[in-house]
């Protein structure tokens, strides 16, 4: 088995999907988890205005709405959380995503004060954060807020991770990568677009340039610029297509060096890191 085949198998990626079937699969997956643990009453997700959180948010609201109707449990709710750092440049996209999702409840937690306070505390301890590390601080503060909300609402935190993100480890460890349940796992980027199109999402929300937008020195830095490959390259790789060796090498390089992000904390029984 080639490394490409191993990666495709590990991430559950497919070369072709039926969008309607995958929508139903994700919704039923979320419902089944909540039904298994009836003390859980909410799904919590941060909404950024980008493709991934818009899709995960819509699927989460669908799952909650269906389950509430099936069980007559009015306590069930989907909580969409806005988590700006100060003023968000694409705030209108966030509002458009909220309008499309129609969440039961919307909360806004501005993380700037908490991030600055943490940065100042570290500075006083002699640690000056780089812009890149400060970006990770933002991602972790966002996740911290979501877990606090989930803790107070008997909820679980929904993640936006998908195959095209997982393969490159393009997420913050214990930030946006630290979630409870990931309904998009297995899908690549273009397949996520297909699901949103099938759901009637406004095109500008899934055709916009993907960006983590974490760094102050490089605001709205496109994911593809940070990775050195395009999402079309990554999706083609995940669909089993043959890529130029130089492109495949970049993708596989990201996969190998970010393996630790896709695992639980390393123990004496792990040996993947010895490769």
From Swiss-Prot:
Q: Pfam family of this protein, just one? A: NAD_synthase
List the EC numbers from the record: 6.3.1.5
Q: Tell me which residues bind Mg(2+).
A: 52, 165
- Which reaction(s) does its UniProt entry say it catalyses? deamido-NAD(+) + NH4(+) + ATP = AMP + diphosphate + NAD(+) + H(+)
Keywords, alphabetical: ATP-binding, Ligase, Magnesium, Metal-binding, NAD, Nucleotide-binding
Q: How does it assemble?
A: Homodimer.
- What is this protein called in UniProt? NH(3)-dependent NAD(+) synthetase
Per the UniProt record, the source organism is Salmonella arizonae (strain ATCC BAA-731 / CDC346-86 / RSK2980)
According to the entry, what is the taxonomic lineage of the organism? Bacteria, Pseudomonadati, Pseudomonadota, Gammaproteobacteria, Enterobacterales
The gene it comes from is nadE
């Amino acid at each position: 088995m080639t490394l490409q085949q191993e990666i495709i198998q590990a991430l559950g990626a497919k070369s072709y999907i039926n969008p309607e079937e995958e929508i139903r699969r994700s919704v039923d997956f979320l419902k089944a988890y909540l039904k298994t643990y009836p003390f859980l009453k909410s799904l919590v997700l941060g909404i950024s205005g980008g493709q991934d959180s818009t899709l995960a948010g819509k699927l989460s609201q669908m799952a909650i709405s269906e389950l509430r109707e099936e069980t007559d449990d009015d306590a069930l709710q989907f909580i969409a959380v806005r988590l700006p750092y100060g003023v968000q440049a694409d705030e209108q996209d966030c509002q458009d995503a909220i309008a499309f999702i129609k969440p039961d409840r919307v909360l806004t937690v501005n993380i700037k004060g908490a991030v600055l306070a943490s940065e100042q505390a570290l500075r006083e301890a002699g640690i000056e954060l780089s812009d890149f590390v400060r970006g990770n601080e933002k991602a972790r503060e966002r996740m911290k807020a979501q877990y606090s909300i989930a803790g107070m609402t008997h909820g679980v935190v929904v993640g936006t991770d998908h195959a095209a993100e997982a393969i490159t480890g393009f997420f913050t460890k214990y930030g946006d990568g630290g979630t409870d349940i990931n309904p998009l796992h297995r899908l690549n980027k273009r397949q996520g677009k297909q699901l949103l199109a099938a759901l009637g999402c406004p095109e500008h929300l899934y055709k916009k340039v993907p960006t983590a937008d974490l760094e102050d020195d490089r605001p709205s830095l496109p994911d593809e610029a940070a990775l050195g490959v395009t999402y079309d390259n990554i999706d083609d790789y995940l669909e089993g297509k043959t890529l130029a060796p130089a492109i495949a090498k970049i993708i596989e390089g990201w996969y190998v060096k970010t393996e630790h992000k896709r695992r639980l904390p390393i123990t004496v029984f792990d040996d993947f890191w010895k490769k």
